[in-house]
């Protein structure tokens, strides 16, 4: 749960299981990642589409749209299923189910992926595998030295140029 949403016991149990594995110095297996991440993606993507529906009723907003940030597995699924999304900036580094890597092969919109190279919680090889899997002909991996909170100030400027190029082309 978040905000006014009720907590979901099964998610709390899965998060506790993940925490236990990580605190013990282990790596979560694919089954745990699937049981934790995929149900969250299944819930979050329709909610995100509902938010996008509501936002696009505002006169100052129009298609095409871009998405930025958040949980990368949600972003991959959303980019795959929602035709209104023309470009995406995604933050690499979280646990990614194999099914999401498979879905990434069908994501063909322009992508800008931010990867903090020294993020202790980052699963760098998974991030690289996911980036490689994307089906987009235009994809950029911006890998920066630094931890989770070490994103350089100019990284936002790069993302702004990316979205300007794809959402507001000149000519």
Language model regions located:
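Alpha/beta-hydrolase active-site loop
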Residues: 3-59
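Primarily recognizes the serine-hydrolase "nucleophile elbow" in alpha/beta-hydrolase
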Residues: 46-106
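Conserved alpha/beta-hydrolase "acid-adjacent" motif
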Residues: 99, 120-126
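Short, conserved loop/helix-junction motifs that constitute active-site signature segments
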Residues: 103-108, 133-136
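Short beta-strand/loop motif that positions the catalytic acidic residue
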Residues: 107, 113-115
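Acidic catalytic loop of the alpha/beta-hydrolase fold
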Residues: 117-122, 149-150
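Catalytic histidine neighborhood in serine/cysteine hydrolases
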Residues: 128, 132-150
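Catalytic active-site module of serine/aspartate enzymes centered on a nucleophile-bearing elbow/loop
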Residues: 145-146, 151-171
């Amino acid at each position: 749960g978040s905000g006014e949403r009720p907590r979901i016991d099964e998610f709390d149990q899965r998060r506790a299981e993940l925490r236990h594995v990580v605190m013990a110095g282990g790596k979560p297996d694919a089954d745990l990642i699937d049981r934790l991440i995929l149900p969250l993606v299944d819930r979050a993507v329709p909610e995100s589409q509902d938010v996008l529906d509501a936002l696009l009723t505002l006169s100052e907003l129009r298609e095409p749209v871009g998405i930025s940030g958040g949980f990368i597995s949600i972003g991959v699924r959303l980019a795959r299923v929602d035709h209104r999304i023309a470009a995406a900036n995604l933050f690499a580094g979280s646990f990614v189910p194999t099914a999401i890597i498979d879905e990434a092969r069908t994501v063909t919109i322009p992508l800008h992926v931010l990867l903090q190279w020294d993020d202790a919680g980052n699963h760098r090889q998974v991030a690289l595998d996911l980036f490689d899997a994307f089906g987009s002909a235009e994809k950029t991996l911006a890998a920066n030295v630094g931890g989770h909170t070490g994103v350089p100030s100019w990284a936002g400027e790069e993302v702004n140029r990316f979205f300007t190029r794809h959402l507001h082309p000149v000519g």
